Amino acid sequence: MGDWSALGKLLDKVQAYSTAGGKVWLSVLFIFRILLLGTAVESAWGDEQSAFRCNTQQPGCENVCYDKSFPISHVRFWVLQIIFVSVPTLLYLAHVFYVMRKEEKLNKKEEELKVAQTDGVNVDMHLKQIEIKKFKYGIEEHGKVKMRGGLLRTYIISILFKSIFEVAFLLIQWYIYGFSLSAVYTCKRDPCPHQVDCFLSRPTEKTIFIIFMLVVSLVSLALNIIELFYVFFKGVKDRVKGKSDPYHATSGALSPAKDCGSQKYAYFNGCSSPTAPLSPMSPPGYKLVTGDRNNSSCRNYNKQASEQNWANYSAEQNRMGQAGSTISNSHAQPFDFPDDNQNSKKLAAGHELQPLAIVDQRPSSRASSRASSRPRPDDLEI
């Protein structure tokens, strides 16, 4: 029974990827089945055939009667039961190793993409696809594997097959032996000359072990059923809470489109002002310096307000009768982006700009012209 160490090492790796019920099931399998089968049970059935005696001298009669009473030894039957029950768990472990291998490949690919990203290559979509694949395989940070998706289905299938094998071996044992051993077996089979009685060694001790292994099988079956219901209801609960696939919830949440035509967006997001229209009376080469915010996506920012301001300015210049050449260099100051509320108030008022000087354009009267032509005492003589 020294070969049990290899199976024990494999099953021990399943502990890290099992639920609480699965860990208890593995403990029951190790302690009450493998260890007990490798120590006490094997020694109890060690003299099984050698101590089987029949009240006849006919050669070969004891062998055929033993074969009829015990088609398969209890020890070998329980070994087969442990192997069959452990196979679904080993298949689940193989799936876990497959997922871990996938994780290594995805991590390697992710590192290569991050190196390419540092060189200026746009790999955001590829990195997003890798994250989705990791979630699909149940891979979390720090190499931890979470039970979801295909891994969860494999785990549920393994529990189902373990339960089926437990029930099948219990039925086979009941059909072949029953759950107790008799001290005397009656045999009538060739080449026995007549019906003979055969005697079994330590029947009570063997019956105790049979009942004990029966109880362990029932406990294992109950743990499988409990774990199956636990995994099922936990999956339903996660789906109700929306935790089963958070990528579906976040993938549809697209960022809102930016309205570059909005005045508030242009002001608060650094949109550059359009080039303001020059006044009709502006001299050649005159240019109004505007604020540059390094963003050409919002060139229609505050266009109507700029045109209205320049129209008001031109009307004031025409009314005042001033030439465009009198524009001082003080107009070439950086264009300010006022607040929307202040800008609207100025547009509503329409008379924010005041004339620099008031000139009376009416013609002078005759009296005033004559009075102005008379010499005054304080006039300077040339």
From Swiss-Prot:
Modified residues (Phosphotyrosine): Y247
Cellular component per GO, a single term: Golgi membrane
Annotated spans, Interaction with UBQLN4: 264-382
Polar residues compositional bias, start-end: 317-332
Annotated stretches, region: Interaction with NOV: 244-382
Molecular function as annotated in GO: alpha-tubulin binding; beta-catenin binding; efflux transmembrane transporter activity; gap junction channel activity; gap junction channel activity involved in cardiac conduction electrical coupling; gap junction channel activity involved in cell communication by electrical coupling; gap junction hemi-channel activity; glutathione transmembrane transporter activity
Cysteine pairings via disulfide bonds: C54-C192, C187-C198
InterPro entries linked to this entry: Alpha_helix_dom_sf, Connexin, Connexin43, Connexin43_C, Connexin_C, Connexin_CCC, Connexin_CS, Connexin_N
Outcome following mutation: A253P: In congenital heart malformations
Effect of T290N: In congenital heart malformations
Glycyl lysine isopeptide (Lys-Gly) (interchain with G-Cter in SUMO) crosslink residues: K144, K237
Tissue and organ distribution: Expressed at intercalated disks in the heart (at protein level). Expressed in the fetal cochlea.
Main localization (coarse): membrane
UniProt modified residues of type S-nitrosocysteine: C271
Pfam families per the UniProt record, alphabetical: Connexin, Connexin43
Keyword Transferase: no
Membrane topology reported for the UniProt record: Multi-pass membrane protein
Summary of subunit composition and partner proteins: A connexon is composed of a hexamer of connexins. Interacts (via C-terminus) with TJP1. Interacts (via C-terminus) with SRC (via SH3 domain). Interacts (not ubiquitinated) with UBQLN4 (via UBA domain). Interacts with SGSM3 and CNST. Interacts with RIC1/CIP150. Interacts with CSNK1D. Interacts with NOV. Interacts with TMEM65. Interacts with ANK3/ANKG and PKP2.
Disorder: Oculodentodigital dysplasia: A disease characterized by a typical facial appearance and variable involvement of the eyes, dentition, and fingers. Characteristic facial features include a narrow, pinched nose with hypoplastic alae nasi, prominent columella and thin anteverted nares together with a narrow nasal bridge, and prominent epicanthic folds giving the impression of hypertelorism. The teeth are usually small and carious. Typical eye findings include microphthalmia and microcornea.
Family, similarity comment: Belongs to the connexin family. Alpha-type (group II) subfamily.
Protein name as catalogued: Gap junction alpha-1 protein
